[in-house]
């Protein structure tokens, strides 16, 4: 298990939103960065409206990377990433992370999704079998990895 370091308390707070048709990061109401990526778009175009197989997952990763990589230059360092998104809160629930979801926990869930995608047979009983949930997990994993964010703070709606 690797150590997870919380950002300093005075680190800028950035809200992550992943919507059906688009996403965004916000430092404030006036300062936003649009992410050209939507969960339903990913589900429809890459997952073909079902849980992803290995190829769909790989294609989804490529699409997500292209969409999120430019945001890395916009993000302040260090950063406190936060979210109120229902799907991201549900990912945290599955990971048993009530207040803070770590990159390590996200990676563990993604590994389960990848194993499920690579094999035939019954689905992983821990993972919700909803394509939008899988898309949100994929996007969150790629964001945390490429933006080098160790945790995301969860705020109830």
What are these regions (language model features)?
Residues 2-11, 27-157:
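Helical "lid/coupling" subdomains associated with nucleotide-phosphate turnover
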Residues 13-17:
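Short glycine-aspartate micro-motif
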């Amino acid at each position: 298990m690797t150590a997870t370091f919380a950002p300093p308390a005075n680190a800028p707070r950035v809200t992550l939103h992943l919507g059906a048709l688009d996403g965004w990061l916000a430092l404030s109401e006036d300062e936003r960065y649009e992410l050209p990526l939507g969960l339903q778009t990913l589900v429809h175009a890459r997952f073909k409206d079902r849980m992803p197989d290995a190829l769909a997952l790989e294609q989804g990763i490529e699409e997500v990377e292209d969409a999120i990589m430019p945001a890395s230059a916009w993000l302040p360092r260090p950063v406190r990433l936060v979210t109120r998104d229902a799907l991201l809160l549900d990912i945290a629930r599955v990971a048993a992370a009530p207040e803070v979801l770590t990159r390590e926990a996200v990676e563990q869930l993604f590994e389960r999704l990848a194993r499920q995608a690579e094999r035939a047979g019954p689905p992983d009983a821990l993972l919700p079998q909803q394509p939008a949930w899988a898309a949100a997990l994929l996007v969150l994993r790629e964001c945390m990895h490429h933006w080098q964010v160790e945790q995301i703070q969860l705020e109830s709606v």
